[in-house]
């Protein structure tokens, strides 16, 4: 490539391209820096304090004199005190000249200022083999040899205050110039097709070599704890000082060489607060100062395994969505779900996005009709966000269980399970409709059996499970009215002898009249009544069912009625009761004796309501009454003997 200047053809050997400028190199040596009172440079990079007055020098190595001499390789010599990054590799001041590749990128430390270098000259042998490219002359008045960056765009290339904004220069390729109409020092150029192919090939080679190598100046994808583990595990004796950890990190990750020193504070905080790092004091024999840091031996294997595990970049969700055909990298959404995901969807759905977007067209019947407690909110198909992952369609059904309203109360309870018998009758579930709260009672049907201790209701032989009968909870009625509890008895299954093993008592009655409803009358307790009542018939005391049910019932062909509060059996048969119960019954039936105040005060206090007295108190009172009666009887006998 050549440029005609004042009728003379000047070869262009290389191109330097920045954000807002482009410079064509037509001589063997070019200096890059910033202009000052001491002198000017060929390429001025503005007034940034991070750039020295003479920062870089690019020259051509080869034999011959003059501009038309044979062109060899390009070399870079660093003259600035801050150094320079060449494709992510830091080049220090005073280092030997670095041979430049055909395409590379320079970046000044602590800034985002970059220069892309492209070598346009080829060897003499290649010139003979390759066809000459056409030359297009440009206007002679726009071919300066020295360029300057205007001050009005200096803010675009000023250094950033935070190291987090540093952009990596690795894997960068020649970018197209921005602002084609705004740059006043832009030159016309013609690039041969073979050079374009070489530039593309070099870019592909760099991509294949791996852009996130340790020499990359971008921020490494590791946490500070991982960097500490890497440094300590790579030490010969598995321990390092704080300064040694700093040195290891800056040596392997160039990003931290020029970044803000705040990362060192983070390293110190991790060492102090992380329980996996142990501080080991330095022995007196060891020279130097500062303690060593080691890894907890109990957790060393686990930490070493995770030391080089890369973190997810910020902004990426920490969970993987289920696999599906929809994502930003996959095929377009199906028409049925066009309302759920837009074309710019990223494949990650949030509750807010689901509520804003429309519902998909259902492909199946409404699930709320099949199951009223489930309401289908959304059905969506997701895709794995990782590139190159296999796609699969798995529907995700989001459901919400509806709770029954508080006003709806169940009114039917099942108290008996269907019993399988040897008869031909079909088992029927017995259902008891509860009008008021009553004790649990289970009634079963007995067919084909007429033994003793069975009773007939409505033409059916019935057996009552006494083991299920429980004493009901007593409720006081202030007005003294009786409270009725009705139980509706419906059809019940038939059972045989094996099913009777669970029934503890079988009672026979001679009643054969049809009966549809069993009415249980609850007798309220008075103010001074005890929960135990004495019921006598034919001079025989009767005890409550809670006591009588423990004994064996032997009387047959006798009529009984069921009374609540307390539950008692009444009849003309004989009952076996303990003396304690006889005394308790007698004491409850006897009248209480009046008492007088010791101070002789005639005024009497009103009676205070007494609570329920348990059986122990009744027995104690009964014992006192019996002892007093026995003492009075003994005194009377002594007086009679005298």
Curated annotation (Swiss-Prot):
What is this protein called in UniProt?
A: Forkhead box protein K2
Biological processes per GO annotation: canonical glycolysis; intracellular glucose homeostasis; negative regulation of autophagy; negative regulation of DNA-templated transcription; positive regulation of DNA-templated transcription; regulation of DNA-templated transcription; regulation of glucose metabolic process; regulation of transcription by RNA polymerase II
Q: Which InterPro entries match?
A: FH_FOXK2, FHA_dom, FHA_FOXK2, Fork_head_dom, SMAD_FHA_dom_sf, TF_fork_head_CS_1, TF_fork_head_CS_2, WH-like_DNA-bd_sf
Q: Which UniProt keywords apply?
A: Activator, Cytoplasm, DNA-binding, Magnesium, Metal-binding, Nucleus, Repressor, Transcription, Transcription regulation
Q: What GO CC terms are in its UniProt record?
A: cytoplasm; nucleus
What does the tissue specificity note say?
A: In neurula embryos, expressed strongly in the future floor plate and weakly in the neural crest progenitor cells. As development progresses, expression becomes stronger in neural crest cells. At stage 24, expressed in the eye, brain, branchial arches and in the presomitic mesoderm in the posterior embryo. At stage 29, additionally expressed in the pronephric tubules. At stage 35, expressed in the migrating lateral muscle precursors of the abdomen. Additionally, the developing proctodeum and head structures including the branchial arches, eyes and otic vesicles continue to show expression.
Which stretches does UniProt call biased (Basic and acidic residues)?
203-219, 606-615
| Bias-annotated ranges (Polar residues) | 327-353, 589-605
UniProt key word Transcription regulation: yes
Major place of residence: nucleus
Instruction: Detail which positions bind Mg(2+).
Output: 271-272, 274, 277
Q: Where in the cell is it found?
A: Nucleus; Cytoplasm
Q: Describe the location of the FHA domain by residue ranges.
A: 30-91
Spell out the Pfam families in the cross-references. Answer: FHA (PF00498), Forkhead (PF00250)
Q: Which organism is it from?
A: Xenopus laevis (African clawed frog)
The record, for PROSITE patterns, names: FHA_DOMAIN (PS50006), FORK_HEAD_1 (PS00657), FORK_HEAD_2 (PS00658), FORK_HEAD_3 (PS50039)
Q: Which GO terms describe its molecular function?
A: DNA binding; DNA-binding transcription factor activity; DNA-binding transcription factor activity, RNA polymerase II-specific; DNA-binding transcription repressor activity, RNA polymerase II-specific; magnesium ion binding; RNA polymerase II cis-regulatory region sequence-specific DNA binding; sequence-specific DNA binding; transcription cis-regulatory region binding
Task: Supply the domain comment.
Answer: The C-terminal part of the DNA-binding domain may contribute to DNA recognition specificity.
- The record places the DNA-binding region at 219-314
Region: Disordered; residue ranges are 201-221, 323-359, 589-615
- Functional summary from the UniProt entry: Transcriptional regulator involved in different processes such as glucose metabolism, aerobic glycolysis and autophagy. Recognizes and binds the forkhead DNA sequence motif (5'-GTAAACA-3') and can both act as a transcription activator or repressor, depending on the context. Acts as a key regulator of metabolic reprogramming towards aerobic glycolysis, a process in which glucose is converted to lactate in the presence of oxygen.
DNA-binding: region residues: 261-279, 289-293, 309-314
Which PANTHER family does the entry link to?
Answer: CHECKPOINT SUPPRESSOR 1-LIKE, ISOFORM A-RELATED, FORKHEAD BOX PROTEIN K2
């Amino acid at each position: 490539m050549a440029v005609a200047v004042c009728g003379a053809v000047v070869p262009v050997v290389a191109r330097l391209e920045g954000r807002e400028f482009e410079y064509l190199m037509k001589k063997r040596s070019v200096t890059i820096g910033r202009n000052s009172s001491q002198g000017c440079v060929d390429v001025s990079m503005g007034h940034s304090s991070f750039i020295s007055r003479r920062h870089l020098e690019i020259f051509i190595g080869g034999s011959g004199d003059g501009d038309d001499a044979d062109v060899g390789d390009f070399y870079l010599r660093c003259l600035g005190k801050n150094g320079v990054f060449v494709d992510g590799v830091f080049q220090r001041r005073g280092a030997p000249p670095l041979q430049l590749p055909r395409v590379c990128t320079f970046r000044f430390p602590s800034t985002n200022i970059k220069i892309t270098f492209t070598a346009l000259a080829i060897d003499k042998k290649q010139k003979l083999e390759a066809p000459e490219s056409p030359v297009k002359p440009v206007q002679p008045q726009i071919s300066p040899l020295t360029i300057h960056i205007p001050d009005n765009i200096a803010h675009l290339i000023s250094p950033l205050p935070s190291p987090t904004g540093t952009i990596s220069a690795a894997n960068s390729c020649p970018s197209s110039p921005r602002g084609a109409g705004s740059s006043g020092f832009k030159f016309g150029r013609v690039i041969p097709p073979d050079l374009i192919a070489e530039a593309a090939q070099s870019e592909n080679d760099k991509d294949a070599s791996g852009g996130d190598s340790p020499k990359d100046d971008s921020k490494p994808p590791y946490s500070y704890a991982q960097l500490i583990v890497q440094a300590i595990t790579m030490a010969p004796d598995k321990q390092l000082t704080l300064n040694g950890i700093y040195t290891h990190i800056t040596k392997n990750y160039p990003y931290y060489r020029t970044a803000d020193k705040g990362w060192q504070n983070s390293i110190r905080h991790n060492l102090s607060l992380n329980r996996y790092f142990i501080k080991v004091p330095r022995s007196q024999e060891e020279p130097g100062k500062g303690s060593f840091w080691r890894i907890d031996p109990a957790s060393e294997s686990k930490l070493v395994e995770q030391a080089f595990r890369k973190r997810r970049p910020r902004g990426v969700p920490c969970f993987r969505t289920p696999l599906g055909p929809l994502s930003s990298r996959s095929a377009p959404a199906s028409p049925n779900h066009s309302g759920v995901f837009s074309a710019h969807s990223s494949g990650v759905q949030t509750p807010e996005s689901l509520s804003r977007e429309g519902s998909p067209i259902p492909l199946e019947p409404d699930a709320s009709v099949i199951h009223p407690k489930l309401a289908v909110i959304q059905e969506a198909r997701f895709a794995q966000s990782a590139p190159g992952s296999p796609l699969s369609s798995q529907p995700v059904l989001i459901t919400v269980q509806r709770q029954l309203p508080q006003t709806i109360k169940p009114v039917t309870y099942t108290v008996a399970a269907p019993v399988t018998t040897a008869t031909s009758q079909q088992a029927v579930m017995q259902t008891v409709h509860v009008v008021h709260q009553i004790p649990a009672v289970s009634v079963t049907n007995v067919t084909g059996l007429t033994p003793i201790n069975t009773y007939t209701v409505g033409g059916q032989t019935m057996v009552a499970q006494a083991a299920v009968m429980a004493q009901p909870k007593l409720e006081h009625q202030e007005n003294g009215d009786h409270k009725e509890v009705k139980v509706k008895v419906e059809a019940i299954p038939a059972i045989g002898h094996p099913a009777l093993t669970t029934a503890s008592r079988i009672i026979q009655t001679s009643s054969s009249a049809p009966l549809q409803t069993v009415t249980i009358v609850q007798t309220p307790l008075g103010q001074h009544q005890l929960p135990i009542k004495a019921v006598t018939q034919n001079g025989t005391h009767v005890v409550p069912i809670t006591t009588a049910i423990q004994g064996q019932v032997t009387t047959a062909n006798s009529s009984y009625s069921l009374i609540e509060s307390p539950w008692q059996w009444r009849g003309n048969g004989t009952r076996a009761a303990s003396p304690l119960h006889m005394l308790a019954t007698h004491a409850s039936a006897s009248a209480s004796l009046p008492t007088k105040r010791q101070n002789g005060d005639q005024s009497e206090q009103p009676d205070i309501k007494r609570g329920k007295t348990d059986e122990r108190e009744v027995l104690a009172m009964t014992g006192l009454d019996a002892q007093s009666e026995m003492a009075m009887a003994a005194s009377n006998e002594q007086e009679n003997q005298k």
